[in-house]
């Protein structure tokens, strides 16, 4: 049995602020350290460590020498005793951090439960208390444990097994989901753009990155049939880990190849054609959110209810691309016939009925409901790939108890049809405040994702290139000390000499004067509601274009309603706000500052069930010239090259 011996080292004198997300940052440890070095011992009960404080590994428990507080004499503790201590004391003091870890009065905690509040750092010198570079520092409250990443023991394997799949799946699925959401105008942003990124736990993600090898590859192959056509789906993923100043970067290239294997590969796109679904079936598949529908317009129920006669043209009541939180067909309701109406419910509490046979309703259903399902399925796809990758890294392929569904070719096919022929990129950054009880620190997360397609005689290749970086915003000075933000005790960000972008139940999101692209996410001392908006609306941060479109079209609709049908016939008069026009105009992106050329991006697909997809809009072949083959990401200082792809070559 492989075992190890822990050495003793007194805690250093200095104690410095630890930036949670900075992996290479020189910091001093807090009041507790533990160290280990390789060795072997017999599997016997632990002896009393009188003068020689030695902690050991055994079959079930790992013992550590722990310095607690200012006591110079270490105490022997098992890992589970450490976690238990963290559960009973530290977690109770962290009760306000509800967005990161659920806490009750009698917490029972496992490694998986506390994974999201780890402070994890790879050491490049002795400043963090660990002796060699191959050791990693893991913090449980005020206790530091040094773990050799290459150690082949049950404790480290168990920790990797819990953290790595979770972190990698969050990175891949969240990044691609964010890319698709932004590509299609942040449609449904309440769930699927920046709010969609709430599922990403940066500390867990970076812990998983640290456990990954510097380079790794995985290839999966799966045969399937579409109408007696023999097809193959080939999924390949490559990971490259890069250390940068103050942080860590992981680059991933995921490739999907759809290949026709019979008939010499002719008409390979047959392998991408799956049966469409019916929007009414989707609505009936999901149970109603409540037992009522379309309350009578004259009855007060504590929140405003729009009349069923209201058309989608009256957008002054809501922002439809972000506010729809539930759509369903009423069941057993006398106000709305089951087979002809659908109920819409918004974040603000509006709800109303609309006829299913109206074009505006169908378009809206396809956009909002379909897009939400599309991102959900895409997220599961990338999670599946990440889990397979993590299993390979851990050398536990086929591990008993691990359930991973097969990669669905229908989802990959829908991605192929929906993404533009050109190379598309998103380059996003946002800030996250320290989620622990320590002094507040600020880290910046960069997510850069690009997609490209290439056609072959017998196959199609879809490539997703992702760069994920977390680094300290300021390596020498806390951002809050620069007075760009003022940090309140409960974790709320208050603006100082900056613009308040959004305020929700006492929580403010600020744009500092020095950076108009920053989004700050801070904890708040309240129980989070399921429909609570905790992220700033993305359209307000990136550009005002989407809001301008809505405002102009809303004015046009109101003038048209006021002046009658003849107003619509005016050559330069505002148009009536039809949903087709609304969707088309909303998904426009400027390529040039002079507005000469626009690239029309429309929602083109969704796949609400596992084995089906449907094209909602037929894409136009619009190209943005002079983009070149390389894209420069300023924060990484290098070019991202998509192989085999030339813009405008189709």
Curated annotation (Swiss-Prot):
Identify the glycosylated residues: 52, 290, 332, 338, 359, 422, 516, 552
Which loops or segments lie on the Virion surface side of the membrane, by the record? 33-650
Chain ranges passing through the membrane: 1-32
Q: How is it modified after translation?
A: N-Glycosylated.
Disulfide partners: none
Q: How does it sit in the membrane?
A: Single-pass type II membrane protein
Keyword annotations for this protein? Glycoprotein, Membrane, Signal-anchor, Transmembrane, Transmembrane helix, Viral envelope protein, Virion
Q: Does the keyword S-adenosyl-L-methionine apply?
A: no
UniProt subcellular location:
Virion membrane
Does Cytoplasm count among this protein's keywords?
no
Question: How would you summarize the oligomeric state and partners of this protein?
Answer: Associates with the gp82-gp105 complex.
Query: Which protein is depicted?
Result: Glycoprotein 105
Q: Supply the source organism for this entry.
A: Human herpesvirus 6A (strain GS) (HHV-6 variant A)
């Amino acid at each position: 049995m492989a075992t190890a011996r822990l050495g003793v080292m007194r805690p250093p004198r200095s104690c410095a602020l630890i930036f949670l997300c900075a992996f290479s940052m020189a910091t001093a440890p807090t009041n507790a350290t533990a160290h280990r070095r390789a060795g072997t011992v017999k599997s016997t009960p632990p002896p009393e460590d009188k003068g020689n404080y030695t902690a050991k590994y055994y079959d079930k428990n790992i013992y550590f020498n722990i310095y607690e507080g200012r006591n110079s004499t270490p105490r022997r503790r098992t890992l589970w005793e450490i976690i238990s201590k963290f559960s009973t004391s530290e977690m109770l003091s962290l009760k306000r951090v509800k967005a990161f870890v659920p806490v009750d009065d009698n917490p029972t905690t496992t490694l998986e439960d506390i994974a999201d509040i780890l402070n994890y750092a790879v050491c490049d010198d002795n400043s963090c208390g660990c002796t060699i570079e191959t050791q990693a520092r893991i913090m449980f409250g005020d206790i530091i444990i040094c773990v050799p990443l290459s150690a082949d023991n049950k404790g480290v394997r168990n920790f990797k097994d819990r953290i790595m799949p979770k972190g990698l799946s969050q990175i891949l699925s969240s990044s691609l989901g964010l890319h698709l959401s932004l590509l299609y105008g942040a449609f449904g942003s309440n769930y699927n753009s920046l709010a969609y990124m709430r599922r990403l736990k940066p500390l867990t993600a970076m812990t998983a990155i640290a456990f990954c090898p510097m380079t790794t590859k995985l290839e999966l192959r799966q045969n399937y049939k579409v109408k007696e056509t023999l097809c193959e789906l080939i999924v390949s993923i490559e990971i490259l880990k890069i250390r940068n100043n103050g942080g860590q970067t992981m680059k991933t290239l995921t490739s999907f190849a759809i290949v026709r294997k019979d008939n010499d590969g002719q008409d390979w796109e047959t392998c991408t054609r799956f049966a469409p679904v019916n929007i009414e079936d989707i609505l009936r598949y999901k149970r109603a959110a409540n037992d009522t529908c379309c309350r009578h317009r004259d009855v007060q129920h504590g929140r405003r209810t729009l009349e069923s006669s209201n058309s989608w043209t009256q957008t002054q009541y809501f922002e439809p691309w972000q506010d729809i939180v539930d759509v369903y067909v009423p069941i057993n309701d006398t106000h709305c016939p089951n087979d002809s109406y659908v109920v819409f419910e918004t974040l603000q509490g509006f709800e109303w009925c609309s006829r299913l046979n109206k074009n505006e309703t169908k378009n809206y259903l396809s956009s909002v409901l379909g897009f939400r399902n599309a991102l959900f399925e895409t997220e599961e796809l990338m999670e599946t790939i990440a889990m397979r990758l993590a299993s390979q890294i851990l050398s536990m392929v086929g591990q008993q108890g691990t359930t991973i569904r097969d990669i669905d070719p229908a989802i990959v096919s829908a991605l192929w049809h929906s993404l533009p022929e050109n190379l598309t990129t998103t380059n996003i950054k946002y800030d996250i405040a320290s989620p622990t009880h320590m002094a507040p620190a600020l880290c910046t997360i960069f997510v850069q994702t690009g997609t490209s397609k290439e056609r072959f005689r017998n196959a199609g290749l879809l490539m997703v290139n992702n760069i994920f970086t977390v680094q300290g915003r300021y390596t020498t000075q806390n951002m809050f000390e620069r007075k760009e933000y003022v940090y309140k005790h409960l974790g709320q960000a208050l603006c100082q000499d900056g613009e308040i972008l959004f305020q929700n139940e006492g929580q403010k999101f600020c744009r500092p004067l020095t950076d108009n692209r920053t989004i700050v996410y801070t904890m708040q001392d309240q129980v989070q509601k399921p429909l609570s908006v905790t992220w700033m609306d993305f359209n307000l941060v990136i550009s005002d274009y989407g809001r301008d479109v809505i405002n102009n079209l809303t004015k046009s609709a109101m003038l048209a309603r006021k002046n009658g049908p003849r107003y619509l016939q005016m050559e330069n008069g505002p148009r009536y706000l039809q949903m087709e026009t609304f969707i088309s105009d909303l998904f426009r992106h400027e390529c040039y500052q002079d507005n000469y050329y626009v690239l029309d991006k429309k929602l083109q697909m969704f796949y609400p069930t596992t084995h089906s997809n449907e094209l909602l809009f037929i894409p136009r072949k619009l190209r943005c010239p002079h983009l070149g083959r390389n894209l420069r990401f300023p924060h990484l200082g290098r070019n991202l090259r998509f192989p085999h792809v030339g813009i405008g070559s189709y």
